[in-house]
UniProtKB/Swiss-Prot annotation:
Gene name, Swiss-Prot/TrEMBL: yoeC
Keywords: DNA integration, DNA recombination, DNA-binding, Viral genome integration, Virus entry into host cell
Active site: R40, K64, H128, R131, H154, Y163
InterPro entries: DNA_brk_join_enz, Integrase-like_cat_sf, Integrase_catalytic, Tyrosine_recombinase_XerCD
GO molecular function: DNA binding; site-specific recombinase activity
UniProt name for this protein: Probable integrase/recombinase YoeC
Record-linked Gene3D superfamilies: Intergrase catalytic core (1.10.443.10)
GO terms for biological process, alphabetical: chromosome segregation; DNA recombination; establishment of integrated proviral latency; symbiont entry into host cell; viral genome integration into host DNA
Domain called Tyr recombinase: residue spans: 3-176
Stated family: Belongs to the 'phage' integrase family.
Amino acid sequence: MHIVQPIRSLEKIQEVKQYLLNKNKRDYFLFIFGINSALRISDILPLQVKDVQNKDHLWATESKTKKKRKILILESLKQEIYEYTKDMKENEYLFKSVRTRKPISRIQAYRILREAAAACGLEEIGTHTLRKTFGYHFYQRTKDIAELQRILNHSSPSITMRYIGIDEDTTRAAYKVFGGL
């Protein structure tokens, strides 16, 4: 099983953003949307313009849990949504394939992110990195694990901490302090 990590460094996030912005508008928006929405890639890819344009929130039926959830759209993301969708039709998919006009596949999304990660010197990156990155930075800024647990729809705080890589960070720091015998 391939374990993926959040992108912990804000500088690396900016580097990935710049790389994708220079490469492809759709791919850049996929990254921006993913790290700012806390949605799974399987819930992001089928979204259409009408789901997000001029909205304060979106409704998503989670593919994993089948629960319908109201997802707030961050103010910072609203401008990105406007810029990306202003010339699109409301029934267009946000992340459509140039060839089929249908949503890109999870495999294609994975390839996009892996290519950007490799170009920016990141390892252990996959589609789940987007959601984990949201969680990691939400926690770093708010320290509110209960709210993050609710946002991510996890059953316990310990699952959320492990999911966003905080357990690993804590263990690494403890080993560093210990230093050895």
